[in-house]
A protein has these predicted regions:
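N-terminal signal peptide c-region/cleavage motif recognized by signal peptidases
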Residues: 17-21
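Short hydrophobic alpha-helices and adjacent helix-cap/hinge residues
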Residues: 2-9, 22-180
Length: 180
C-alpha cells in the first residue's frame, strides 16, 4: 500500500514538473515574440532626437528573465545600422535615460508608477499592464483571442520625438489622447 501511495505521489510530482515546464516554455515563447515586436517597433520608427548617442541601440528592461530571451532573439540584429545592446536597468536609476527603448513587464508595474518619466524624454516606452499608456507609456501589449496584440498612443510617441511607421500603426489599436 505504501508503495502505491509513493508511486502516485511521484506521478503527481512529475505531472507538476511537466506543467511547470510547459508554463516556462510558454513564457519563453511569449517573451521571444515580444522581443521580436520590440525589434520591429524600433526598426520601423524614427527617433528625431537620440536618447543618448552611444554607437549602439540600447534596449532596456528591469526584467532579467525577459532580457535573457531578448538577448537570444536579437543576437546580431541591427536597428538603423546600429548593433543592439540589451541592458538590465533599475527603474529608479539615472541610467534609464541612456535607453532608446524601455520594456516594462507586468512584474515591475509598481516601480513604473514611481519612475521619473522626465528621464525618458526620447525613449520608446513599451509595457504590458492595462494602465501602462495611462501611466505615461507609448505602446502596450495585450492578449486577444490568445494572440499578442498591441496598442499605440501615437501622440505620446510624437511628444517623445519618435515617429512610428504608418504601416505598423495600421496593425495596432490606436489610443488617442484622453482615451487612455
Amino acid at each position: 500500500m505504501r508503495l502505491i501511495k509513493r508511486f502516485f505521489k511521484s506521478v503527481g510530482v512529475l505531472l507538476l514538473l511537466q506543467v511547470a515546464a510547459v508554463n516556462a516554455e510558454l513564457n519563453d515563447k511569449e517573451a521571444a515574440l515580444k522581443a521580436g515586436f520590440l525589434f520591429n517597433f524600433a526598426r520601423y520608427s524614427d527617433w528625431q532626437v537620440a536618447a543618448t548617442p552611444v554607437g549602439y541601440f540600447k534596449l532596456c528592461s528591469p526584467d532579467s528573465d525577459f532580457l535573457d530571451t531578448a538577448s537570444w532573439v536579437l543576437h546580431q540584429q541591427t536597428i538603423h545600422g546600429l548593433g543592439i545592446k540589451v541592458a538590465l536597468v533599475e527603474l529608479d536609476s539615472l541610467n534609464i535615460n541612456q535607453c532608446n527603448l524601455l520594456f516594462v513587464t507586468h512584474r515591475y508595474r509598481e516601480q513604473w508608477v514611481t519612475t521619473d518619466k522626465s528621464l525618458l524624454l526620447h525613449t520608446m516606452l513599451v509595457g504590458e499592464t492595462p494602465d501602462f499608456i495611462k501611466l505615461g507609456g507609448h505602446i502596450r501589449f495585450f492578449l486577444a483571442s490568445g494572440k499578442i496584440r498591441f496598442e499605440v498612443a501615437p501622440e505620446s510617441l510624437k511628444k517623445a520625438d519618435i515617429v512610428m511607421s504608418s504601416k505598423v500603426l495600421r496593425l495596432s489599436r490606436i489610443v488617442k489622447e484622453g482615451e487612455q
